């Protein structure tokens, strides 16, 4: 309709997003999440994060997670956090798409794969 290579996809189902994604009060069972696609390729993914301790516990249980195993993560939420969000962008994906590079590893300065794991960093 708008003749654009970009499209936003929003309001993913709660079952398809991580526990920390905030639920959308206006759309039952959906989250305040989005992806930005460029010519069918996901470039950016983001969401408003859940900042309320009790809701995080509830969402962890909904996902089948044990909140006790996330105690360190949850500590800050006990004292209150402001509303916040986050996103991640795939710059290498965008570079590969703009330059018509078929393999993303060729658009990445230090590509990672199963054969390029630096064991010193994991010790």
Predicted regions and their residues:
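A translation/RNA-centric and nucleic-acid-associated enzymatic feature enriched
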Residues: 1-123
């Amino acid at each position: 309709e708008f003749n654009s290579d970009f499209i936003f996809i929003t309001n993913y189902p709660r079952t398809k997003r991580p526990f920390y994604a905030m639920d959308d009060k206006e759309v039952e069972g959906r989250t305040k999440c989005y992806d930005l696609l460029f010519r069918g390729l996901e470039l950016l993914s983001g969401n408003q994060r859940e900042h309320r301790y009790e809701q995080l516990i509830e969402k962890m249980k909904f996902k089948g997670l044990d909140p006790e195993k996330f105690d360190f993560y949850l500590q800050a939420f006990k004292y209150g956090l402001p509303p916040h969000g986050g996103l991640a962008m795939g710059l290498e994906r965008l570079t590969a798409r703009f330059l018509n590079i078929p393999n993303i590893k060729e658009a990445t300065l230090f590509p990672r794969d199963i054969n390029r794991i630096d064991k010193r960093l994991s010790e």
